C-alpha cells in the first residue's frame, strides 16, 4: 500500500500550496525540500520577498527625502544597509516559519532531502524511499548565467542580497524584471546604475509605449541604459569590474548578472522515470500531467510562466486533476505580471502590439496619473493606465505604470478573467479619490469618453 496519496518535490509557492490543497482534500501528503533553510522556495528566501523588503526600505528613504514637499521638515536620511538587510532577514524568517507551520497544521509530512524519481510513483530521498499514488514535481528554477568570460566575477540575484554595503556604482547585465528591479532599488539607494540589455527594449514583453516611457523616467533619475548591446567580457581592472560590450566599456564597483533563470530539473531522474522534457523544462499538458503515469509538474520547472502566483495556480489545478474526479485545464489568459520598480509596472493579457499581431481590431484607452486627484495628493504622478479592447469592447489586456500598479492590476485581471467589456468596467462605481479611478477612466477612454482629460479631436 502506498505511504502517501501525493508526494511533492519542492516547497516553493507551487509545491507548498499544492500540498496544502491536497491535504485539505483529505489526502496523505509528503513534501520534500532539499535545503533546510529553503522552505518556501526561491520566491520566499532569495527572490520575491527579500527583494521587495529591500525595495520597501528604499521607498521609505525616498519618501523621507521628499518630506519637504509636504511641509514636513526632517534631517537628511541615511541608508543603514545592515539594518535594511536585518529587517529583510526577519521578514523572510517569519514567513518561512509560517510556511512550515501551515504544512504542519494541515498534516503534511515535511522531509528535508533532495527528492529524485525512483520509478513509477516512488521517490528516493537521501536513502529513504517514499511511495505515493501520485507525484507532483515542483523543483523550481535556478539562476541562468550567460557564457561570458569572467561571469564568475559578477553577482547574481541570489548573492547580491548579501553584499556588505551599497555599491557606489553598479552595472546590471539584463533588462528583464529582475535586472530592472535591482537597478531601480540601487538607484534609489544612491548607486550610479547602468543597465546593459541585449534586446531593443527593457522588460519585454511589456507594451513598447510604456517601456519607452519608463526608460525616459529612468534617464531622468540618472540610470543609463544601453539597448541592443551584447556583453563580451567581465574583468577586474584597477580595483573595479570592467564590462566590455558591443557598444563600449563600463567600469563599476559591482556587476550584477540578471539574464534569467532556467528550470531546476537536473538529477531528478526524469529520463529514467519516462518524464519527457522540452529543452530543460518538464513537458506538461493542459492538465499539468507529464508523460509518466500519475506524475504531474508545475511552476518554473515547466517554463510555462516563471511567476510565483502562476506556480500556486498550477498547483491547485494539478492537485484537482491528480486527486479529484473531474479534469480541469489551466487557463493562463488572466495571469498578471508585476515589476517592483519606481514607478511600479504591472500588466495582464495582451499588449496593443501583441493584440494587433494576433489580428485583432484594437481599441485603446489611456489615462495619465498626472490627471488623477489621488495621484496628485500622493505626489506620484508619473505613468499611465492603458486598456486594450477588441472591436466589440471586450478587454484584451491592461498595462499600468504608476503608483501601486502591482495592486491595481488585480481589478484588471478580474475583468479580463470573467470576460467583461471596457464599458462594463467603467460602469463600476470607483470610490473617489482613489488610484483605481485611473483604470475606470482608461476604460472610458476606449470609447473616447474619459472625463478628466481633454476630449479627443474629432477627425
Annotate the PLM regions.
Residues 151-167, 249-326, 415:
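FAD-site-proximal beta/loop scaffold in flavoenzymes
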Residues 112, 284-286, 389-390:
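Short, acidic, Ser/Thr-enriched surface-loop or helix-capping motifs
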Residues 19, 23, 183, 187-188:
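Gly/Ala-rich phosphate-binding loop of Rossmann-like dinucleotide-binding domains
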Residues 15, 179-180:
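N-terminal Rossmann-fold NAD(P) dinucleotide-binding loop
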Residues 2-4, 20-27, 33-166, 194, ...:
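Glycine-rich flavin
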Residues 9-18, 23-37, 42, 49, ...:
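Flexible, glycine-rich terminal cap/loop adjacent to redox cofactors
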Residues 7-9, 115, 130-140, 172-173, ...:
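Short hydrophobic core segments
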Residues 1-12, 166-176:
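Beta1/beta-strand and adjacent pyrophosphate-binding region of the FAD-binding site
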Amino acid at each position: 500500500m502506498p505511504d502517501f496519496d501525493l508526494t511533492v518535490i519542492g516547497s516553493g509557492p507551487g509545491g507548498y500550496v499544492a500540498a496544502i490543497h491536497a491535504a485539505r482534500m483529505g489526502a496523505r501528503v509528503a513534501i520534500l525540500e532539499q535545503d533546510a533553510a529553503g522552505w518556501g522556495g526561491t520566491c520566499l528566501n532569495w527572490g520575491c520577498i527579500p527583494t521587495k523588503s529591500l525595495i520597501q526600505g528604499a521607498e521609505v528613504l525616498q519618501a523621507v527625502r521628499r518630506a519637504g514637499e509636504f511641509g514636513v521638515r526632517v534631517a537628511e536620511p541615511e541608508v543603514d544597509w545592515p539594518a535594511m538587510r536585518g529587517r529583510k532577514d526577519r521578514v523572510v524568517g517569519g514567513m518561512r516559519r509560517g510556511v512550515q507551520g501551515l504544512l504542519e497544521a494541515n498534516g503534511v509530512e515535511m522531509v528535508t532531502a533532495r527528492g529524485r524519481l525512483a520509478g513509477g510513483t516512488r521517490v528516493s530521498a537521501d536513502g529513504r524511499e517514499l511511495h505515493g499514488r501520485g507525484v507532483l514535481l515542483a523543483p523550481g528554477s535556478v539562476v541562468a548565467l550567460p557564457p561570458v568570460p569572467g561571469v564568475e566575477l559578477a553577482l547574481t540575484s541570489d548573492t547580491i542580497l548579501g553584499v556588505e554595503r551599497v555599491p557606489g556604482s553598479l552595472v546590471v547585465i539584463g533588462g528583464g524584471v529582475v535586472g530592472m528591479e535591482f537597478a531601480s532599488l540601487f538607484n534609489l539607494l544612491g548607486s550610479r546604475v547602468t543597465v546593459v540589455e541585449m534586446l531593443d527594449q527593457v522588460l519585454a514583453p511589456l507594451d513598447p509605449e510604456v517601456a519607452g516611457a519608463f526608460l525616459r523616467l529612468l534617464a531622468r533619475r540618472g540610470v543609463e541604459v544601453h539597448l541592443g548591446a551584447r556583453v563580451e567580457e567581465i574583468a577586474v581592472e584597477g580595483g573595479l569590474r570592467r564590462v566590455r560590450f558591443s557598444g563600449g566599456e563600463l567600469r563599476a564597483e559591482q556587476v550584477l548578472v540578471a539574464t534569467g533563470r532556467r528550470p531546476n530539473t537536473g538529477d531528478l531522474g526524469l529520463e529514467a522515470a519516462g518524464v519527457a522534457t522540452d529543452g530543460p523544462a518538464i513537458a506538461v499538458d493542459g492538465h499539468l500531467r507529464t508523460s509518466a503515469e500519475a506524475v504531474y509538474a508545475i511552476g518554473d520547472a515547466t517554463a510555462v510562466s516563471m511567476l510565483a502566483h502562476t506556480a500556486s495556480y498550477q498547483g491547485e489545478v494539478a492537485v484537482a486533476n491528480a486527486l479529484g474526479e473531474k479534469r480541469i485545464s489551466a487557463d493562463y489568459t488572466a495571469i498578471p505580471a508585476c515589476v517592483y520598480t519606481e514607478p511600479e509596472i504591472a500588466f495582464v493579457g495582451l499588449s496593443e502590439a501583441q493584440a494587433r499581431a494576433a489580428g485583432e481590431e484594437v481599441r485603446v484607452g489611456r489615462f495619465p496619473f498626472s490627471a488623477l486627484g489621488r495621484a496628485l495628493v500622493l505626489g506620484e504622478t508619473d505613468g499611465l493606465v492603458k486598456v486594450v479592447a477588441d472591436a466589440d469592447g471586450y478587454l484584451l489586456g491592461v498595462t499600468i505604470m504608476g503608483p501601486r500598479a502591482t495592486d491595481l492590476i488585480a481589478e484588471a485581471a478580474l475583468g479580463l478573467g470573467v470576460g467583461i467589456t471596457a464599458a462594463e468596467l467603467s460602469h463600476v462605481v470607483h470610490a473617489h479619490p482613489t488610484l483605481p479611478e485611473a483604470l475606470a477612466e482608461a476604460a472610458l477612454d476606449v470609447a473616447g469618453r474619459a472625463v478628466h482629460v481633454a476630449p479627443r479631436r474629432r477627425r
